[in-house]
Swiss-Prot record:
Protein's UniProt name: Ubiquitin carboxyl-terminal hydrolase 26
Superkingdom of origin organism: Eukaryota
The Ubiquitin-like domain, residue ranges: 961-1037
Catalytic activity: Thiol-dependent hydrolysis of ester, thioester, amide, peptide and isopeptide bonds formed by the C-terminal Gly of ubiquitin (a 76-residue protein attached to proteins as an intracellular targeting signal)
Residue ranges of every copy of the USP domain listed in the record: 106-446
Biased composition (Basic residues): 1-12
Length: 1079
């Protein structure tokens, strides 16, 4: 059984009776009649209605596939994009900010850098006693004190607002805080409580007037005790108020150790002895802090920042710090009590590594149900029954499990070695938490009844004050209305989208007209596609004003107002029902029915089609004639000149229906400026003769005006003027060729570029190497290039430029001497230095370049009496040591250790050359954003190849191979540097790229180590393209480069703190301002 053929299963079969458009046009042109069948063929009406194409086919007016996506399909934009994308275009949905319930706390907006204030405000609000105290304030007091008023309004919104977060801007603005500057949350709390304490003192409500002192104020005394008499100092009995206890954490692991450190006894001895009033002398003594009373809420401020005197900046201590869920403070009091048990109620967290930046969040316990919440500005997250969230996979009620201290640190274990007070860790039920970012801890006293059982004494009167009810209700009503309006707008828009989609599907379902239907209408594909794909149907533009949506068929009309067959790929064939649906709703047009085919356009198309066939056939028949003409085989009869390159390109072009622009001008390249035939030996005037038939075809299809085409029969004579000019040029070139030939023969060895063997006692002359290189290229240029290269600069001018005006000495040095196999030569160069030539060559140069023989720069090879004599001679050029071999050594031994050097007349001007080289060096070291290569070397020393590349002297304006910038296995890097880049900055780049800390880098250029971090690369003579190598000493530990960079970026400024805000205003100034607000 044979398998079915599926190779062409996706191709639609062509109807057997379908003719090609070319055949139809030929029939129309020959008969002059247009039949109904011709219309079907030319307008592709015969094509079947298709289904399931991958895209919309331009070749079929009956194809409506791809105008809309498949079922359940979507597009990136327009009517058929995802529903959520359509809704997003309506703007933000206010309902996303809806608060779940008043049982869920609300957040506060961050105005830029106000997270420090937000976290403190949330801690204060979640304290039920403090909140009730603020809510109990009299309205008259609120009017007199703007800060209290804004705080009460903020608390009221946090209490009853339907929004998930509250705008803190009015409160921040009232305090005159700079919302763009990050501040310290501890300092803010201290100053804010002080400000509140002064403002609340005007209230007549007892619970509100002293709420700050009642909740947060405790007392301590600084006790100094004489070691001799055992008496306390008089000042020891004085008590000082505190609102928080500042605890050291550096080198300490937990809260118990920090409290021990805070209450530890200090010995006063030696130079710090205390003068005892009782003993009347300086004696040894002890000093300590004693807790006299504790408030219901104790704030522990953890000193996470230490001052660095070297950089005058603060650095954060990021070590883990442990603290318990319950804390017994009774034993800490000067009069011990067992009823002072505190529970953890809030944790203020500072995220970030820098002291002057980062982010504050607060973890606060809800006193009503024991749930913990994270307050991160606008975002509020439920943490569960533990301050850092439930441990995944663990039940919170298992007493043998300790909760996680944070998401990144394990809970602290009860290790006696790490505990200062065993009593604090005896219970296996006790919860311990650990954090690397905890900045402040709030503990609230646990109230107990007479039987020692914890009691919840939270007041049930937690309702909103009556003077805020109307305001909050109005805000909530406005917000709910905004949410409802958005939902209504969304519903209307989605209903419209659904309606539009149903409309498009309905029309497109009815749109296809079968080939047999005689009644149909044409519509622009572009308009139909936009109508089917856009949310709003396309609209024409009239005088710049968009009018009602309407059908636009003007792009598919011809100049006669009908439908041309040439536009069939830009239009679709609609059924009568689909057209009437669109036209009745959108109007427009013009209406183009099945009878609106254009007879005039069809006749023109038939004529053009026949002309194209004729052109194509004629060109095909003449190709063999053109090929024979290029081969020189022409038939008898008249011949004409055409450009040979042009005819070659004409043959290479594809056979098209009409002549192209490239077919014009077959004789343009042969026509001179005088309108005559160019001589054949002129540049670009190569020609070939073609028969008359081919010429007439090229003439007719050139596309040029008749007057612009110049015909050259084969007996045409070349232009006399151009011939004469070319003869003159040829004569000049012949003379130049003879002169160059003579010079090449006269200076045969010099022309070849071979090194000249130098001998002591002979006279030589010096010529600039650059001039000699130009002269060699000039005389060796032949053929077409014989006159293309310019003549070198006058030799006399060149020689004169080598003499300095100040000292009349040479401004360049002779090239270095090289001695190989007993022969002395000069190092080869085409750009730098002076090359020595023989006396005979100089005599010939004098004659050829009209230079006086006496102006020559003389030189000779001499031997020094000793190596010291050679070094002391200013005009001496030393021999290259690396080129010495055994023969040279034998020669040197025969000469008694003397070395050859070049003696010049005039002498070399070392002063001017040194000044010029210094300027060039300075200019070269003044570079910007250039590449250097750094290799990482593992081992004791760098490989020889790297050392030599690193020590190589850079060549001016050298081109560096791209391959030299490739890295191999991460062992080399290419860095962009400038001459002003410091060694320190370069080491930071290497640190970032190769991971070697700055202190461990042993950086070298060649064998010289690069030191002094403050020196620039220009100071160290490091040039563009240089190769350096670095080795890791591994002496210092690795650390993060971010620490180094952040320290460098910190600009030391005087800390302003809260200067200029109400938090630092005096009480009198605050009172005056309060009165002015009330006015």
């Amino acid at each position: 059984m044979s398998r079915p053929n599926t190779r062409n299963k996706s191709k639609r079969p062509r109807a057997d009776d379908c003719e090609s458009p070319s055949a139809v046009f030929k029939k129309i042109h020959s008969t002059g009649a247009i039949t109904k069948g011709d219309i079907k063929q030319l307008y592709m009406v015969w094509k079947p209605v298709c289904h399931g194409c991958h895209g919309n086919s331009k070749d079929s007016p009956n194809c409506f596939c791809g105008l809309i996506p498949a079922a359940n399909g979507v597009r990136k934009s327009g009517l058929w994009q995802r529903t959520n994308e359509i809704i997003r275009a309506l703007g933000p949905n206010p309902s996303t900010d809806l608060r779940d319930s008043t049982e869920t706390p609300a957040g506060l907006t961050n105005l830029g850098a106000t997270c420090y204030a937000n976290s403190i405000l949330q801690c204060l609000y979640m304290n039920t006693s403090f909140r009730l105290g603020i809510f109990s304030l009299e309205p008259d007091i609120l009017k007199m004190h703007p800060v209290l008023d804004q705080l009460a309004r903020l608390f009221a919104q946090l209490h009853s607002s339907k929004m998930a977060f509250i705008d803190s801007a009015p409160f921040i603005k009232t305090l005159e805080l700079d919302n763009g500057v990050q501040q310290d949350s501890h300092e803010f709390l201290t100053l804010f409580l002080s400000l509140l304490e002064g403002s609340l003192s005007h209230s007549k409500v007892p619970g509100a007037r002293t709420i700050v002192q009642h909740l947060f104020r405790g007392s301590v005394s600084h006790v100094t005790r004489c070691s001799s008499c055992g008496r306390d100092s008089e000042a020891s009995s004085k008590m000082e108020d505190f609102y928080e206890l500042e605890l050291n954490i550096k080198g300490l692991n937990n809260l118990e150790q920090s409290l021990d450190d805070y209450l530890s006894t200090e010995a006063l001895d030696g130079e710090n002895q205390y003068f005892c009033e009782s003993c009347q002398k300086r004696v040894d003594a002890t000093r300590c802090i004693k807790l006299r009373s504790l408030p219901p809420v104790v704030n522990f401020q953890l000193k996470r920042y230490v001052f660095l005197p070297k950089t005058t900046t603060k650095k954060k201590i990021s070590s883990a710090f442990s603290f318990p869920g319950q804390l017994d403070m009774g034993k800490r009091l000067s009069n011990p009590s067992s009823s002072y048990t505190y529970g953890l109620s809030a944790i203020l967290i500072h995220k970030g590594s820098a002291a002057n930046s980062g982010h504050y969040v607060a973890h606060v316990k809800d006193e009503s149900n024991g749930q913990w919440w994270e307050f991160d500005d606008e975002h509020v997250s439920k943490l569960g029954l533990h301050p850092f969230g439930e441990k995944p996979g663990k039940s919170s009620n298992k007493t043998d499990q300790k909760p996680q201290g944070s998401s990144t640190a394990d809970s602290v274990t009860n290790d006696d070695n790490n505990s200062c007070h065993e009593a604090a860790f005896t219970s296996t039920m006790e919860e311990m938490f650990s954090s690397t970012d905890a900045y402040m801890l709030m503990y609230k006293r646990i109230a107990k009844d007479e039987n020692g059982i914890e009691s919840n004494n939270i007041s049930s009167n937690n309702s909103l004050p009556h003077h805020f009810v109307d305001e909050i209700d109005e805000r909530n009503t406005s917000y709910v209305k905004e949410c409802e309006e958005y939902e209504s707008k969304k519903d209307v828009h989605l209903a419209y989208i659904t309606e539009r989609r149903q409309e498009v599907k309905s029309v497109l379902t009815e749109a296809p007209a079968t080939p047999e239907e005689d009644s149909y209408f044409w519509i622009s594909t572009d308009w139909l596609r936009q109508w089917a794909d856009n949310v709003n149907p396309p609209s024409p533009i009239i005088t710049g004003v968009r009018v009602h949506s309407s059908i636009d068929n003007s792009p598919i009309q011809c100049e006669h107002g009908k439908v041309p067959a040439s536009k069939v790929t830009s239009m679709k064939r609609l059924s009568a029902g689909a057209w009437h649906k669109l036209f009745s709703k959108y109007g427009g047009g013009p209406t183009l029915s099945s009878d609106d085919f254009c007879m005039e356009c069809l006749k023109d198309g038939a004529k053009n089609s026949v002309s194209a066939d004729v052109y194509r056939d004629r060109k095909a028949s003449l190709r063999s004639i053109a090929e024979a003409a290029l081969a020189g085989n022409n038939p008898d009869g008249p011949l004409y000149f055409v450009s040979r390159p042009w005819l070659t390109q004409w043959l290479r072009r594809k056979n098209v229906d009409i002549p192209s622009d490239a077919d014009s001008g077959p004789t343009i390249a042969l026509t001179c400026t005088h309108g005559n035939l160019l001589p054949e030996h002129a540049s670009g005037a190569k020609r070939v003769t073609v028969p008359e038939d081919l010429w007439l075809f090229l003439y007719e299809t050139s596309g040029m005006k008749i007057d612009d085409i110049v015909t050259f029969p084969s007996d045409s004579q070349p232009c006399g003027i151009c011939s004469q000019q070319l003869s003159v040029v040829a004569s000049v070139e012949d003379n130049l060729r003879a002169v160059k030939l003579k010079q090449r023969q006269s200076h045969e060895k010099l022309t070849s570029g071979k090194s000249l063997a130098l001998h002591p006692g002979q006279k030589y002359y010096l010529v600039p190497s650059s001039w000699l290189s130009e002269w060699r290229a000039y005389i060796t240029a032949t053929g077409k290039n014989i006159s293309s290269l310019p003549e070198p600069q006058s030799l006399e001018v060149t020689i004169n430029s080598l003499i300095c005006e100040k000292h009349s000495r040479l401004l360049q040095r002779p090239l270095d001497l090289v001695c190989k196999r007993g022969t002395i030569t000069q190092k080869a160069s085409n750009t730098d230095g002076l090359t020595m030539i023989s006396e005979s060559d100089w005599i010939l140069f004098s004659e050829e370049w009209n230079v006086a023989h006496g102006k020559g720069l003389c030189a000779e090879i001499v031997f020094s009496k000793s190596s010291q004599d050679n070094l002391q001679s200013s005009e001496a050029v030393p021999i290259l040591v690396e080129d010495l071999d055994q023969s040279t050594n034998d020669l040197s031994n025969d000469l008694g250790g003397r070395e050859p050097y070049v003696r010049t007349d005039p002498e070399v001007c070392e002063e001017c050359i040194g000044e010029k080289e210094s300027c060039a060096l300075v200019e070269k070291l003044n570079y910007q954003n250039e590449d250097i290569q750094v290799y990482l070397v593992r081992g004791k020393e760098a490989p020889k190849s790297i050392r030599e590349a690193s020590a190589a002297v850079p060549v001016p304006d050298r081109r560096t191979s791209k391959r030299s910038r490739r890295t191999t296995s991460g062992n080399s890097i290419s860095l962009k540097v400038s001459g002003s880049t410091t060694v320190y900055q370069l080491k930071l780049m290497i640190w970032e790229s190769l991971g070697i800390v700055k202190e461990n880098q042993e950086l070298h250029k060649g064998s010289v180590e690069i030191e002094d971090d403050f020196a620039t690369l220009a100071d160290k003579c490091i040039f563009p393209g240089d190769v350096l190598w670095v080795k890791d000493s591994e002496i210092y530990e690795n650390r993060d480069i971010a620490d180094e960079i952040s320290e460098q970026k910190v600009v030391v400024q005087t800390e302003e703190g809260f200067r200029g805000t109400l938090l630092t205003s005096s009480a009198s100034a605050q009172l005056c301002q309060d009165i002015s607000f009330s006015d």
